UniProtKB/Swiss-Prot annotation:
UniProt signal peptide: 1-22
Ranges where the record places region Disordered: 75-100
Ranges of the Intravirion topological domain: 23-45
Bilayer-spanning residue ranges: 46-66
Stated name of the protein: Virion membrane protein OPG135
Cellular component annotations (GO), alphabetically ordered: host cell cytoplasm; membrane; virion membrane
Subcellular location: Virion membrane; Host cytoplasm
Classification via Pfam families: Pox_A9
Source organism of this protein record: Monkeypox virus
Positions annotated as glycosylated: N79, N89, N96
Transcription as UniProt keyword: no
Membrane topology reported for the UniProt record: Single-pass membrane protein
Family indicated by similarity: Belongs to the chordopoxvirinae A9 family.
Virion surface side: 67-83
């Protein structure tokens, strides 16, 4: 993998992470708005519900990022094995044609 590809992938990953972080913040603000209407903002249950909601949102984000990275790794492994098979096929064709 070239240096440029690695840099582009890392910048792309960071950008996606920022988008996901913004989505989590937006969901948290909506959730807090509705919770503040039902619960007092400084009550124990409000804090517990807020902490659990944050943990669930970050858990979903983590699982999604792991899934995306595994799919990318599988795609790269398949591409590498296909290119190795192509190289073997070309070398066997070249060796067969040189014997004639």
């Amino acid at each position: 993998m070239s240096c440029y590809t690695a840099i582009l992938k890392s910048v792309g990953g960071l950008a996606l992470f920022q988008v996901a972080n913004g989505a989590i913040d937006l969901c948290r603000h909506f959730f807090m708005y509705f919770c503040e209407q039902k619960l007092r903002p400084n009550s124990f249950w409000f804090v517990v519900v807020r902490a659990i909601a944050s943990m669930i949102m970050y858990l979903v984000l983590g699982i999604a990022l792991l899934y995306i990275s595994e799919q990318d790794d599988k795609k790269n492994t398949n591409n590498d094995s296909n290119s190795n098979n192509d190289k073997r096929n070309v070398s066997s064709i070249n060796s067969n044609s040189s014997h004639k």
